Amino acid sequence: MKFFLIILILLNFLTTAPKANEVNIFSSRHYSSDIQLYEKFTSISGIKVNVVSGNDAALQKRIIEEGSDSEADLYITADAGRLGLFDQKGMFQNSISPKIKSIVPKSLRSDNWTGIAKRARIIFYSKDRIDKEVINNLRYEDLSDPKWNNKITVRQSNNIYNQSWIASIISNNGKENTDEWVKKFVKNFARDPKGNDRAQILAVAAGEADIAIANTYYYALMLSGQKGLEQQQAAKKVAPYFPNQSDRGTHMNISGGGILKYAPNPENALKLLEFLLTEEAQSHIVKNTFEYPIIDNVEPSEIIKSMGSFKQDLSTPVEDYARFQAVSLELMLRAGWK
């Protein structure tokens, strides 16, 4: 009898013992500055932050396979397309508190995940070979014009940033119009797509192309000197241009996160997500990653500010990037975009 009584006491203790005051992040972001930010959150809240880093494919595979046994509370990554596609697999829970809803524009979140920083995908052109007047009032749609034949460089069609960019064009112009546009756009490539965004800027600097499509933070990273003198000098040979200023504005994407379906610490995950949207956290993020803030009243880094202010496309829902991702890739491959 005493034995069974001891067992009952132990079971009661195990079921009522307080959970550890922690939150577990699975993140594909690769910034040491993010770790500094999590440490700041711990100092303020007392909640310990555990981080599992890796590439998106590996992290998502682990989360899915572990299911309800997963220790992951919060998934953080770059690109709304990635977040949306993972959401379609049913891996998030409602992550949007009234506080987040009041801070983040509806176009930069869903019910289950939210942006924590923005990035722009823009045109970089050769200062030596392209007159600024030729670039003025340029839209993404204009890049299909034959006058740009053999002048454009961009990375491969399997890149999620390109897929989300094309998805945004589908969202605004429809599938048929985008299909025709992509076919003409691909004909203007100066070379077969290869390399990352910085490789596209380097190609323009080297004279292999006149126009590159790349995210702004890659250019800022090069210009900062963090990638070496050669890349810094290359960045100085190109100039940024923000397209579509006469209509919807420049294509914007996000870094973001959402609370996972089986999160063991959802309350702590929400506290961290809300913290990442405070002025202090937003300022820390954009100063270290060269991204744009999600919230107002926060200035981007000096290098990003030097690129100038511009009209951002905040009307196209970033949810559409996952919604049209499959169609986007279909059109790109059909057009011969390698």
Model-derived features: positions:
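Periplasmic solute-binding protein
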Residues: A80-M91, L108-I135, A167, M252-G257
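A structural signal for short loop-to-beta-strand junctions that line the ligand-binding cleft
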Residues: S70-Y75, Q93-I123, E141, K151-V154
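Periplasmic-binding protein-like
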Residues: N150-S157, F275-E299
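Early extracytoplasmic/lumenal segment of secretory-pathway proteins
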Residues: N21-L85, K338
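Ligand-binding pocket segment of bilobal, Venus flytrap-like solute-binding proteins
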Residues: S168, N173-F242
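An extracytoplasmic/periplasmic, membrane-proximal ligand-sensing/linker region
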Residues: E291-K338
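A bilobed periplasmic-binding-protein/Venus flytrap-type ligand-binding module shared by bacterial periplasmic
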Residues: F124-R129, N244, M252-N265, H284-K287
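Short beta-strand->loop
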Residues: F26-R29, W113, Y125-D128, K132-E133, ...
